[in-house]
A protein has these predicted regions:
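Ser/Thr/Pro-rich, low-complexity mucin-like regions
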Residues: 13, 66-72, 139-180, 287-294, ...
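Short, compositionally biased P/S/T/A/G/V-rich stretches that sit at domain boundaries
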Residues: 25-58, 71, 200
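Signature of Gram-negative chaperone-usher
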Residues: 40-41, 53, 110-137, 181-309
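Extracellular acidic, Ser/Thr/Pro-rich low-complexity tracts
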Residues: 63-74, 84-90, 168-170, 215-221
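A short beta-turn/strand-edge loop motif at beta-sheet boundaries
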Residues: 53-58, 71-78, 90-95, 154-156, ...
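Secretory targeting signatures
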Residues: 1-30, 66, 162, 213, ...
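Structural beta-strand segments of beta-rich domains
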Residues: 58-64, 209-211
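Short beta-strand elements
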Residues: 26-36, 172-188
Length: 309
């Protein structure tokens, strides 16, 4: 009998895992954090009552306010520069009372200073300037209190620029600007409260004992000096009259530029250059009519300065 022998074969597949070696190296690296410049995030010009103002009067205090932001904190702030200048003069013009001012806050010693044009903080009220009371914050206000000169150039339509420049202890800076205008300014003073003449009828070219009347004008534009009378000089008792035209005003005691007075203003000095405390003399003269009743005659004398046009 034939026997068939079957073989059962089992295939055993042995999978071997090969372990590859792992190599590790340190990769050097660095991160550079750049200094972020400070920012002048907002600016304003305000009255001392904290009302926003864009048209300023000379000889009046205003707050020039800048809000400063520093990503670290305000201890990084080194200084703040405030420049005021007419657009006609430009930012880099020399300081002058007419058209350019420079002020500085220095954080290292908390000092407020007028760089120019004044030599003694003439246009900066240092005692009213304000820095933040807490410097650990990232943002707060700095306030310059400025009063512009009486001869500061008047403008319309945003003719002046205020520029705040904020610098930190790394020398990085940011800035912001605001335009504004300056009003016209004129002030007149005279040294006489009255004029007195003792006379007889028929006398001419008589001068008051107070001659000359000294007129002092401060203005930021050219001007005329004008004179007039309220009317004829009228006697207090008999009501007789000395005509206005008998009273004259002149630039000196030799009758230079003399004008006869009326109840309308007449120019005695014309197109005078603007400036501070410009002094001019007025000499008064009277012709006394004949005949004339003996009496005390009075009228009001007027002197004014007006813009030259």
């Amino acid at each position: 009998m034939k026997r068939i022998i079957g073989l059962a074969l089992m295939l055993v597949l042995v999978m071997s895992t090969l372990c590859a070696p792992i190599f590790a190296n340190d990769i050097p690296g660095s991160t550079t954090v750049s200094n972020v410049p400070p920012e002048a995030t907002s600016v304003a010009i305000k009255t001392m009552a904290d009302v926003n103002e864009n048209t300023l009067n000379p000889q009046t205090q205003y707050k020039f306010i800048v809000t400063v932001r520093d990503n670290n904190n305000l201890t990084d702030i080194e200084n703040i520069l405030l420049k005021l200048y007419t657009n006609a003069a430009g930012e880099n013009a020399a300081d002058a009372v007419e058209n350019h001012y420079t002020f500085l806050f220095r954080a290292s010693d908390n000092t407020w200073t007028e760089i120019g044009p004044g030599q003694f903080n003439d246009h900066l009220t240092t005692g009213l300037c304000v820095k933040p009371s807490e410097l650990s914050v990232v943002s707060d206000e700095y306030k310059f209190v400025v009063n512009l000169s009486s001869v500061t150039t008047p403008t319309i339509g945003g003719g002046w620029t205020a520029k705040w420049i904020v610098t930190d202890d790394n020398g990085s800076s940011g800035n912001n600007t605001k335009t504004f205008d300056v009003n016209e300014y004129l002030m007149l003073m005279i040294d006489d409260a009255k004029l007195t003449i003792s006379a007889y009828p028929g006398q001419n070219d008589l001068q008051p004992t107070e001659n000359p009347t000294i007129v002092s004008v401060t203005a930021n534009y050219n001007f005329n000096i004008q004179c007039k009378l309220s009317g004829d000089l009228i006697g207090s008792t008999f009501r007789d009259r000395i005509p206005m035209s008998n009273i004259k005003a002149a630039q000196d005691n030799t009758h230079t530029g003399e004008i006869k007075l009326s109840d309308n203003y007449g120019n005695l000095w014309s197109n005078m250059d603007y400036g501070e405390y410009i002094e001019k003399d007025i000499y008064w003269f009277a012709d006394i009519p004949f005949p004339l009743m003996g009496d005390t005659y009075t009228a009001d004398f007027y002197v004014r300065a007006i813009k030259y046009t």
